[in-house]
């Protein structure tokens, strides 16, 4: 793969990463709001007021975002107190797959830019040598760009989901939803 191809692949990876990340994030957030809205317990005191406030705010968000109706009506409602939440977890994982794609594309883009600048610098030195200097094509033919896989993005693909799950567990436990 040439560095020009690597630059194009990097742009495609970044675009695909954002295209996967944004809908997955919106769907996950709406799923969590729907989970919070399904809670219909009769509590007393400040807990009842806070639960009613939460329901009103979620209903207001749904009413004021008609452009997100696709997500409001189709995002899976998780049940963390039991049951299978396969679709919710698949969509949740897609957030981090999108981030890993974007990170991989950003890394490839940086490398392609560095290689392009290196070729230009080397070309200047080769022209200073005169006739025995290498041409641009000869320099470019010697460059081997490694393939980048999203599985090497350790933080965004492996560590960040665990941090988000732990923070979500603490958040929902403190609010009494789990």
Curated annotation (Swiss-Prot):
The keyword Transcription regulation does not apply. It is a multi-pass membrane protein. Keywords: Cell membrane, Membrane, Transmembrane, Transmembrane helix. Disulfide bonds: none annotated. The keyword Transmembrane applies. The chain crosses the membrane at residues 15-35, 80-100, 158-178. InterPro entries: YniB-like. It is found in: Cell membrane. It comes from the Bacteria. GO terms for cellular component: plasma membrane. To Y.pestis YfeE. This is Uncharacterized protein YniB. It comes from Escherichia coli (strain K12). The gene is yniB.
């Amino acid at each position: 793969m040439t560095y020009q191809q690597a630059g194009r692949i990097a742009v495609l990876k970044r675009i695909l990463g954002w295209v996967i990340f944004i809908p997955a994030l919106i769907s996950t957030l709406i799923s969590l709001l729907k989970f919070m809205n399904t809670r219909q317990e009769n509590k007393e005191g400040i807990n009842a007021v806070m639960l009613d406030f939460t329901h009103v705010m979620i209903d207001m968000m749904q009413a004021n975002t008609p452009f997100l109706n696709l997500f409001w009506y189709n995002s899976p409602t998780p049940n963390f107190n039991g049951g299978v939440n396969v679709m919710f977890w698949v969509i949740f994982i897609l957030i981090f797959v999108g981030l890993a794609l974007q990170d991989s594309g950003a890394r490839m883009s940086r490398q392609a830019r560095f290689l392009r600048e290196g070729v230009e610098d080397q070309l200047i030195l080769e022209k200073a040598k005169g006739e025995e200097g290498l041409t641009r094509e000869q320099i470019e033919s010697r460059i081997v760009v490694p393939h980048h896989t999203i599985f090497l993005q350790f933080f965004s693909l492996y560590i960040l989901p665990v941090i988000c799950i732990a923070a979500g567990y603490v958040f929902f436990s403190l609010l009494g939803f789990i």
